[in-house]
Amino acid sequence: MIASRTLALLLMSLFNVGIAIAEDPPPDQIAAAQMMDDLMHGRGTVGGPFTLADPTGRKRSDSEFRGKLMIVYFGYTFCPDVCPADLMAITQALAELGPAARDIQPIFITVDPERDTKVLGEYVAAFHKSFIGLTGTPEEIRKVANAYKAFYAKVPGVGKGEYEIDHTGVIYLMGRDGEYLGFMPPQTGPERLTEILRQYLAK
């Protein structure tokens, strides 16, 4: 579960690259801001090219999803609460959008490749058939996470060798050309997420 210190680090990082909450939008964006009060509009460099492996070992690159909106989520399969809740919200939003959801590619990037790689395919398939789970070496994952300004760190558990991962559980939204559109905070409801996605699908 994301800790308060983690959220503070995330917000500081995003602020430093020019992320702004839509509090006082220009007049022509007022309607959008009212609909998307959970969405942070990006002005800095967040995201970028990546190549990781899917559960079959096939290399997948962000460039193959051009023409679709891309939802990017960093998490891990052992996450007890935040990840399942956010992935379920995404799943419900995709279901609500119906056929239009074909123009959205949801991607789950594990921040725990040591434990997740073997179970990643089954895990994401339990939420929505269009989800693609991606993994890689710890170094590859760290590089992509850094590009998205996503924080994560191992937290020792009770038993020997046990651990959880403290991570930023936000939902990143990327445009049809791969540009960063913004992110939704943890536990954004499916209704709000549907509204946001529907607006961008119409563009």
Task: Go through the PLM ranges and name each one.
Residues 47-48, 70, 168-170:
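Short loop/turn microsegments at loop-to-beta-strand junctions
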Residues 85-144:
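Structural microenvironment flanking redox-active thiols in thiol-disulfide oxidoreductases
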